[in-house]
């Protein structure tokens, strides 16, 4: 999971660098252009130094704690594997027990989710706020990765494929074979898709577009979870828990960054009496 987090940092850095140069170029070549799907040019979010330090610091501490816990886990012995009983698994989870398969195991969907924040470049206002959105995404990924790693290390739940007699013994005797709960692939994709969907919902006004974005955000991690269960990597409860935790993190990180108040100012010229009308909206 830590290699995934490293990839996230690299992708995010590339995203932010490109977003800055592209935004400057767009302003210079066409400064009057406005995205018809945007609410307005006022950002719905704000950053506060103390809060960001707490969030990012918490993510780092969670990841360090998770690494310490998982590094102290020992693989299952042959005797422990032989003593595993399928009947100890609830009927709700039992159908996940099957031979381990590497093909179509959700990795591509996981890697693909790291590219989803690049879609912020398609909108003028989200592109303008690339630095702030980048910080928020790092917080989402750091907290999600840390919580997942720590809970995996504490739970030490045996993966479904370990119960299957057709899975090679060497695959069963790895530390990873004891990190079933909860699904990191599912929680990571859910955190990312719900984060992206929440951000666009706060920036866009077109209800149809927002609905389609949310539908995609819900389906993407669900498909990831299905593949993780279907390849013997996770039980159904692993996937459901990962989905809910990841979605909550992706949704509520933007929520706690919402501005407490917004001031919108607009004006237009009345050509009948040559007067200027000013509209002022102040909301909490």
Regions found by a protein language model. Give the residues of each.
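Lipid-exposed faces of alpha-helical membrane segments in multi-pass integral membrane proteins
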Residues: 54-65, 112-119, 143, 147, ...
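Structural signal for the C-terminal ends of transmembrane alpha-helices
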Residues: 121-126, 197-201
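Sec-dependent signal peptide recognition
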Residues: 2-9
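Transmembrane alpha-helix/helix-exit interface in multi-pass inner-membrane proteins
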Residues: 144-162
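Second-shell loop/turn segments in exported
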Residues: 45, 133-138, 177-178, 182
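N-terminal targeting leaders of membrane proteins
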Residues: 11, 16-125, 152-154, 163-176, ...
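Membrane-embedded catalytic cores of phosphoryl/pyrophosphoryl-handling enzymes
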Residues: 164-270, 277-283
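Interfacial segments of alpha-helical transmembrane regions
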Residues: 124-147
